[in-house]
Amino acid sequence: LISDLMGVVGNVVEVETSYVREYNTQYAAHILGYVQAMSEEDMEKYRPQDENSGYDYDTKVGRDGVEYTFEDWLHGTNGTARVTRTSSGTITSTVYTEDPVPGNHVYLTIDIQLQEAVERILETGIYELQLKRDEDNAKYTMEGKLDEVREDIQGGAIVVVDVKTGEPLAIASYPTFDLSSIIEDYSDLLEAENDPLFNRALNGAYEPGSTFKPCTAIAGLTENIINTETQIECTGLFTKYADQGYAPACWIYTQTDGQLTHGYDNVTEAIKDSCNVFFYTVADNLGIRKLMEYAKNFGLGESTGIELSETTGNMSNPDNHLNYDVDSWVDGDTVQ
């Protein structure tokens, strides 16, 4: 809350403004967001032409997260007090001419204990993955397999949702930052290569990878492309479009240098094994239009409705492929 303290010394009026921001957790920084001094754009929004109303010039406003989304709701109204002092500075009386009005409360669905645990797990997981990647990169470099060397892991995200209500219980993005020192650290955070201020959980758009397989499975079952007993052989490679220069591999085939495959899997086994070839085959038989229909029904490419800023993402399809410098859409693109 902001309080204006007006002290009178002779004929001089001194105006002092104090700010207090207290956080009860060192976690959830991307969710809570932070405040900063007003920009010129903020001035136009929060200081109308009548300068006797609106925010003071030195007011800090929400810049991200809940602080930004609910700025108007959380802000409250300044209070003023007239303070009388002696010539030596001793306060003789304080008269509150206008009491401050606190802002409203915002209640989140976030379980803070779960949030803290998820952030710790995410940080530890990325650290361990990077150690393994460093070992692999060193090995590939020694063996001269420079095309196998991969970039450092820049970050990650975890979202935990109540499956019955859809409410988010934890939203973690790594790397993160310390809200209690955001002002002092802000310049360094802006220049950091791994972009700690960026909320990867809500604002990043990434390929879904194997998490898309249940969508393909449900579409295939519903459209009678497969049933629960249908078996598809994983030979390690999906070769139907090899003549077009596209023969994607199953992960197990790649990781074992072509030594292992999943053999015959039904849909349950394919999900358990995360068999790429099984789902390449199902997707190919479905076709992109039908696959798009089911993806949209699952909410992919659509806004979730969360109050915080989010990126909706996009599913490649024949209607938007020209945006990616692709001349035409072929069946192999559906598999991909």
Predicted regions and their residues:
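Low-complexity, polar-biased intrinsically disordered regions enriched in Pro/Ser/Thr/Gly
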Residues: 41-56, 135-148, 336
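A generic secondary-structure boundary signal that marks alpha-helix termini
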Residues: 40, 79, 127, 131, ...
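Solvent-exposed, polar/charged alpha-helical surfaces in well-ordered, non-transmembrane soluble domains
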Residues: 3, 7, 29-33, 64, ...
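Conserved, well-ordered alpha-helix/loop/beta-strand core segments that scaffold catalytic motifs
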Residues: 2-5, 91-155
